[in-house]
Amino acid sequence: MKRYSILLAVSMVFISALAADINIVFTGDILLDRGVRRAINRHGVDHLFSGGIDSIFRSAQVVVGNLECPATKIVSPVQKLFIFRAEPEWLGALKAHGITHLNLANNHSIDQGREGLMDTRRNIIAAGITPIGAGQNMDEASEPVLLASEPRNVWLVPSLRLALENYSYLTDKPCVSQEPMDSLLNRVHRLRKADSTAVIIVSLHWGGEHTLRPISRQRWDAHQLIRAGADALICHHTHTLQTIEDFHGKKIYYSIGNFIFDPTRPLNSQTCMVRLKVSETGLETETIPVEIRNCVPTIVDHF
């Protein structure tokens, strides 16, 4: 009996060690307006989540999406070409399907002005989701977000790398994270020095829309961020699946494309999710191919 008790104890320790690993999933752009709004009006928000997506989300402790529109009742559009707005009550369905964090460091979060941005942030919190990359000022907006603390800290550092249309860059007003690159590099470097065993993920909203490859300056900046201490870059904005690079053993996803979206071309329908498995000593990265069909992201076997 004593021998069996010892074996059971050893087995439980082994199971606990396995359970200590954490899965974190990243998705591309989530648009809840335009064609997606029409789909929601016809079928409801739940229709946007296929069984395969739900299964992936259920396997994760953290799911991070890029919300490509303000979710607010405030209608105060800025003067720009594409202006979006989602209904805040739709955020509850995102939470119900497993999304835990929403990135706002993009070029559409400000579509309904500063008040719309901060109202979106409040609405995300009210839905039980953590907002990323927006705040009362640039310092707050640029703060790294702790995604997980077990089995070790996992930090996400967000940043918009694009100029905003007809929107003043004011660091002391409500805004999205948009600090200069040298400041971003210093932030990652300081975080690495302060938390040497952490996993640091950088999420950039950048690149040329509808292109398949990053430009040389993007590659340079991405490499500098890895050298500064980032463990991976998982980026978006181009509405396409771009180059996936391995640099010094670290993954760089220059753009993972759309997620919940209304693409009109096959180029914009091919996308991916990224799943990170974090253990006490390792980081595994998995690319999950996705195809968008009638606004609904669907798991596929290959690109």
Protein language model features and the residues they cover:
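Sec-dependent N-terminal signal peptides
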Residues: 4-15
